């Protein structure tokens, strides 16, 4: 996930301005809700989004909009800010898989690309992958804003986080986006299993097939973390840049997710700049948001500062070993 513009919350139905009477009871009618959901899912841009998320947003917009047309437009706007703004091009599963397997029509290799390619080739878990496959993987990671922003410090990011942990044999990547494409650069245990979830069924199909291609066991599933938080028990859960998105959908959703995750270690991260590259005090804002998230919980936390990302490693069970490091790196 990625830095997102702050969404204005819908006007409360009891305080709608004159001439803007909310649909109120009518808006809560199942038929009205279904009409909004059907209209949203009929749009090519959103047809692969989990219907549960669309329904959640539709119910809220129907409660404060005058009619179906306004509710549909407002729901689309919210979905764009939550989901649509971060993928540079529409997910084309077959074309992307062909690109991985053929490695054709890729941009020239940069010095930073070459360093990443060398690092991946040194990883025994993916030593069987050829350079063109890895180049295509890097290219595709750049098609999603969140993973593109992490590319300049990708090696440092995972080396730093995993150095603080005991051997990791299972990972759950919630709201994964294209982050599972970074598996070749993760120092996972030789027998590691990887689980991923996201609200986009097309993306999840691609991630599942990518994992099969590289020979990593696990599973990729469509899951709406606002209505069904969590996942299988794992050693490490990744919640990268998803907390601000969850909080925009429903206040308290990020804390509920972290609490629900069945993992002794959870990595929560936040963006420190907008899509346009502006900082606007986001680091301080999200640090306060994280402090509220863990308030009152008996968890240990390590803080890491990367060039474009603020990360917090949570240890839920203090009996487990980890290596403490400086608060920033």
What name fits each language-model region?
Residues 193-198:
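Conserved SAM-binding motif I beta-strand of class I
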């Amino acid at each position: 996930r990625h830095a997102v513009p702050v969404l204005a919350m819908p006007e409360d139905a009891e305080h709608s301005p004159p001439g803007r009477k909310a649909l109120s009871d009518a808006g809560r009618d199942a038929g009205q809700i279904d009409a909004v959901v059907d209209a949203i899912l009929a749009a090519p841009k959103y047809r692969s989004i989990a219907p549960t998320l669309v329904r959640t947003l539709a119910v809220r917009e129907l409660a404060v909009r005058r009619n179906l047309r306004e509710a549909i437009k407002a729901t689309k706007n919210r979905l764009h800010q939550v989901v649509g703004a971060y993928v540079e091009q529409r997910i084309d599963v077959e074309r992307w898989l062909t690109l991985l397997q053929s490695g054709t029509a890729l941009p020239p290799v940069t010095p930073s690309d070459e360093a990443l390619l060398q690092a991946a080739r040194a990883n025994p878990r993916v030593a069987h992958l050829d350079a063109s496959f890895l180049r295509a993987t890097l290219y595709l990671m750049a098609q999603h804003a969140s993973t593109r922003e992490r590319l300049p410090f990708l090696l440092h990011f995972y080396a730093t986080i995993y150095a603080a942990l005991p051997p990791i044999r299972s990972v759950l990547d919630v709201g994964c986006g294209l982050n599972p494409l970074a598996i070749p650069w993760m120092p996972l245990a030789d027998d590691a299993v990887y689980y991923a979830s996201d609200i986009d069924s097309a993306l999840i199909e691609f991630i599942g097939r990518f994992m099969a291609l590289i020979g990593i066991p696990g599973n990729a599933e469509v899951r709406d973390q606002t209505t069904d938080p969590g996942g299988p028990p794992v050693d490490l859960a990744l919640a990268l840049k998803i907390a601000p998105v969850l909080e925009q959908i429903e206040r308290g959703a990020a804390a509920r997710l972290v609490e629900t995750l069945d993992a002794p270690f959870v990595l929560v991260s936040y963006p420190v700049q907008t899509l346009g590259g502006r900082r606007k005090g986001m680091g301080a804002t999200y640090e306060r948001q994280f402090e509220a998230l863990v308030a009152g919980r008996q968890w240990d936390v390590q803080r890491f500062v990367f060039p474009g990302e603020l990360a917090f490693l949570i240890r839920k069970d203090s009996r487990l070993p980890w290596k403490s490091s400086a608060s920033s790196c």
